[in-house]
């Protein structure tokens, strides 16, 4: 009788048989056979307490029985918010303002507006995002019959469009009398005093209150009008739909939207008492999620701010951080956070680990915190150290629900700032929020300083970040689809047909890992060539 022993060597299972007859192997239809497990489980990968980064390991391939296009990238951002793609832009003043946040949301992610600016400026940026893709516009700009052509021209300069409903009292809820459009004021630029009552269009196509969005869109499409007013039985204006929004919905079907079909947007605030006024402005402008922006989030200041937000705005989603240990995470979870931001000193422009001797290698931090937070249903955002699609996949494979990107998005046309040339290369500025340049920004009123527990009166500030430049990457609207496509193909290689399935594979032991030596890392990169061009998309 044949006897077989199984020996695990360097993470591989090797079978030895006392008989020379070849062993008959059966193929698993799922690709998962406990007796043929190679590599290490996630728990085994970190069991020695080593500080690992994303480049220190690989994920072993799995079984493919689906196409890459079938991979579902939906993933929770917080307890109540789900993204169509697990991608978040960092709240940095050289990464995310309204233009970046709009692009992120259109592609299924979300942008977090930075707070290194005045509260009014930040609230306006949030407002721009919420107004970009309206769906049902519940608070459209409205004119009255006594408004003039000059008022419409001024509104066009401010808002960027010319079509406005006209009601009896010039307010939403007033009886709808007509519409004024660009065709009504054409050639009247020199007649700013003309009343809208004399030029507005009164024959309108409307839809009844309570109509669903697909039906309303069908009416709008058939009418060939630019806007569709929604009225109640008394003929009073209650909402609007715009044709431009219908076009946007077709171009970006996976956009991240709220219940009103408006784009999702987040904003960062500090933990100082004056940030409560900033928070009120952001909430008034429709912000969907708040990130408490701190390099070390395990503080009495953040705990108190979390409790204040939950008491004052119980429905508002709050993400706490940054944290890198389970003990840090516990205090914020106990305070009531809806999500956690993980990372300390791992960003490309961050020097916290070097200067403060404090932090944690990012892969280890993501695994430890996400494993703990999972028990309480709190999603984790991996923040820092993301340099490629592979790093995004690895962060999620360690338990993160989403990744936050800074340098990966800096240099795109949607990032704040102007391009400049150096030695013929088109560049854009990128700086850490802990850099002296960011902390000394004139209009910020100390917002970036508060992230590192400095204030404007400090005589000496210790920099925890640097300033640099990034090569032009083009538009985020081209770059994000590349990242998402790569993420789908990577999940296919691993054998996970969704982001949620990938995370499940961590905890049932189906996902297998392999540590990489320095030589293995060199082997896995381009080598042996005299010269090469690395084009990613």
From Swiss-Prot:
The entry's keywords: CBS domain, Cytoplasm, GMP biosynthesis, Metal-binding, NAD, Oxidoreductase, Phosphoprotein, Potassium, Purine biosynthesis, Repeat
GO cellular component terms listed in the entry, alphabetical order: cytoplasm
Tissue and organ expression note: Enriched in adult ovary and testis.
Alphabetical GO biological process terms: axon guidance; GMP biosynthetic process; GTP biosynthetic process; purine nucleotide biosynthetic process
Positions of NAD(+) binding: 293-295, 343-345
Active site residues per record: 350
Cited PANTHER family: INOSINE-5'-MONOPHOSPHATE DEHYDROGENASE, INOSINE-5-MONOPHOSPHATE DEHYDROGENASE RELATED
Protein role: Catalyzes the conversion of inosine 5'-phosphate (IMP) to xanthosine 5'-phosphate (XMP), the first committed and rate-limiting step in the de novo synthesis of guanine nucleotides, and therefore plays an important role in the regulation of cell growth.
Complex and partners: Homotetramer.
Protein name: Inosine-5'-monophosphate dehydrogenase
Species of origin: Drosophila melanogaster
Source lineage: Eukaryota, Metazoa, Ecdysozoa, Arthropoda, Hexapoda
